[in-house]
Every structure is written in structure tokens, then in C-alpha cells.
Swiss-Prot record:
It comes from Streptococcus pyogenes serotype M6 (strain ATCC BAA-946 / MGAS10394). Gene3D superfamilies: 1.10.530.10. One of its GO terms (cellular component) is cell surface. InterPro entries: CwlT-like_lysozyme, Lysozyme-like_dom_sf. It is found in: Cell surface. It comes from the Bacteria. This is Pneumococcal vaccine antigen A homolog. It holds the Pfam family Lysozyme_like. Its main location: other.
Length: 199
């Protein structure tokens, strides 16, 4: 029994060390885009800030793809149509800035604007009509009743999503329904990047 426990602890320790290394590597890759993000933000009149955009890059691609902010779909309606990181950041910042301005105008919290980056701008109006504060419950309902059906999932089909923040809330997403945990992941990744930047 003791030997089994010792093996389990050794495996857990190895897993934690390995994951820490992977996360640190991904954060460093994302931080390489900081000058590009700073330049883009300086050219835009926006309420977005560098840390928020970097956290969104981490959430979207961890800096591992040319379309670092996954801007293609909102730009052209097709995946992977943007093949240049600068263009991806420029379009992503423009969309985020637009969402933040709309959120302020509608009197909703800024995390609604971040969630709308994943769900689409209409989510801002939805939240304005439902209390003005982005929540997982509202995001879940919107995903199920608006986003998923608009992309063909009219049966409420779900799939398991392996992310710690999702697992806390049941771990399921609606097929074609976007990511109901998106804004929370970005928020979490803000702190993750700050922490990993210290090492």
C-alpha cells in the first residue's frame, strides 16, 4: 500500500513539474507578442490593455499559431484565413475594442465584452437585457439557445471539455455553442501570465 502511494505521489509530482514547464513555455511564447500588442494598442483608441490581450492570446492559441487571436472567423467567416500574427492581433484588438465600447454604452460589465469575443457581439445586448453582468448561467443559456442552434446544433448536443474551470461547473459545452467559460479562462490566464512572468 505504501509503495503504491509513493508511486502515485511520484507520478503526481512529475505531472505538476511537467505541466509547470509547459505552462511557462507557453507563457514565454505569448509574451513574445507583447511589443506587437503594445504597438497595436497605441494605434487604437481603446479601453483594452496589454495584459488582457495577452491573456486572450494565451486562451485562444497559447501563441502557437499564426492567427494568434483566432481572428479569422470574425474577419472572413472562415477558419485560418488570417496567416499573419500582426493582422490577427490588429483585427482581434479592433473587435475587442468595439465590444468594450458597446459594453460600456449598454451598461454591462467588461467581462461581457470579453465573452462576446467568443460568442459574438449580440451577446452584449443579451446581457444588457438580463441583469448587466456576465455569468456562467447566462452564458450557458445563450450558448444553448442562440449560438449552438445558429450553427446547426438544435438538439442541445454537448461534449466534455477538459479544462479545470469547466470541470468545476460540470465540464460540458454545447457542440457549435462557443465556450461558455471563455471570459473566466481569460481572467484566470491574466493571473497565470503575471505569475509565470516572475520566473
Amino acid at each position: 500500500m505504501f509503495r503504491l502511494l509513493k508511486r502515485a505521489c511520484s507520478f503526481l509530482l512529475f505531472f505538476v513539474i511537467y505541466q509547470s514547464f509547459v505552462i511557462h513555455h507557453n507563457v514565454q511564447r505569448v509574451l513574445a507578442y507583447k511589443p506587437m500588442v503594445e504597438k497595436t494598442l497605441a494605434e487604437n483608441d481603446t479601453k483594452a490593455n496589454v495584459d488582457l490581450v495577452l491573456a486572450m492570446i494565451y486562451t485562444e492559441t497559447k501563441g502557437g499559431e499564426a492567427d494568434v487571436m483566432q481572428s479569422s472567423e470574425s474577419s472572413s467567416g472562415q477558419k485560418n484565413s488570417i496567416t499573419d500574427s500582426q493582422a490577427s492581433i490588429e483585427h482581434g484588438v479592433n473587435l475587442l475594442s468595439h465590444n468594450l465600447a458597446l459594453a460600456e454604452e449598454a451598461g454591462v460589465d467588461s467581462w461581457t465584452a470579453v465573452q462576446a469575443y467568443n460568442f459574438g457581439t449580440a451577446y452584449i445586448d443579451y446581457i444588457a437585457k438580463h441583469g448587466g453582468q456576465n455569468t456562467v448561467d447566462l452564458a450557458t443559456t445563450y450558448s444553448k439557445t442562440v449560438v449552438a442552434p445558429s450553427l446547426g446544433n438544435t438538439s442541445g448536443q454537448t461534449y466534455f471539455y477538459y479544462h479545470p474551470l469547466a470541470l468545476i461547473s460540470g465540464g460540458k459545452l454545447y457542440k457549435n455553442g462557443g465556450n461558455i467559460y471563455y471570459s473566466r479562462e481569460v481572467h484566470f490566464n491574466l493571473y497565470l501570465i503575471e505569475l509565470m512572468s516572475l520566473f
